[in-house]
Amino acid sequence: MMIPLHLLRSLEPVTGVCGRSLSYAGARVPAKTQNIINGQWVDSSTDRWIDVHNPATNEVVTQVPQTTQAEMEQAVESAKGAFRSWSKTSAMARQQIMFRYQQLIKSNIGELAKLITLEQGKTLADAEGDVMRGLQVVEHCCSNTNLLIGETMTGVSKDMDLPAFRTPLGVCAGIAPFNFPAMIPLWMFPMATICGNTYIMKPSERYQLVDSDANKCYLATS
């Protein structure tokens, strides 16, 4: 089954829990980020890159591609293709994926918070709060299947019943701001995908690492 997540800007995969082996003091990160399109890590063909700095040392911790129009359109087409199967996946099956995602985020809050501190400069306590507030929405998504059930009102008029159906919208997209790099993306794509939509996520170009690892966890749930 294809996971309906297509990140326009993300981090190349490395080993470890959720795809990373990280120590806070000397975090090893790649020189350039990659895109995720159709569930695959893809190098950008752009020749324009944005440096992401550690605010404590001014060290460049990664470079973010200014993703091309063609790459964006490729992500859209991929999301359209994934929607055909994902929208027909049962709500219970989508719920099981969200349960696994919730557990992976919860188990790696500390590591995700370190990435926020590395690239944004928040204290670890603030960074953990950033992740935790996003996790709360993911936990809500786990119970959202009860809200996806249609309903039927009988006898609304003579010989008339009124059924209601809840169906996915299609391909959705979100652009995340810089100030809460974990929390706000976790407000966006989990809610859309649990409802059967596919999603194109564009995280802030200033803070890539935590979004990348959070979405590695999502890809790992398949």
Predicted regions and their residues:
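Glycine-rich loop-to-alpha-helix module at the N-terminal edge of alpha/beta enzyme cores
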Residues: 59-149, 159
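Signature tryptophan residues that serve as conserved aromatic anchors
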Residues: 41, 83-86, 178, 187
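Ser/Thr-centric signal marking residues that sit
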Residues: 33, 57, 89, 117, ...
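Proline- and acidic/polar-enriched loop/turn elements at helix boundaries
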Residues: 47, 91, 117, 128-129, ...
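Alpha-helix N-cap/helix-start motif
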Residues: 45, 72, 109, 127, ...
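Rossmann-like NAD(P) dinucleotide-binding subdomain of oxidoreductase/dehydrogenase enzymes
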Residues: 150-222
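Terminal low-complexity tails and localization/encapsulation signals of metabolic enzymes
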Residues: 2-63, 96, 150-175
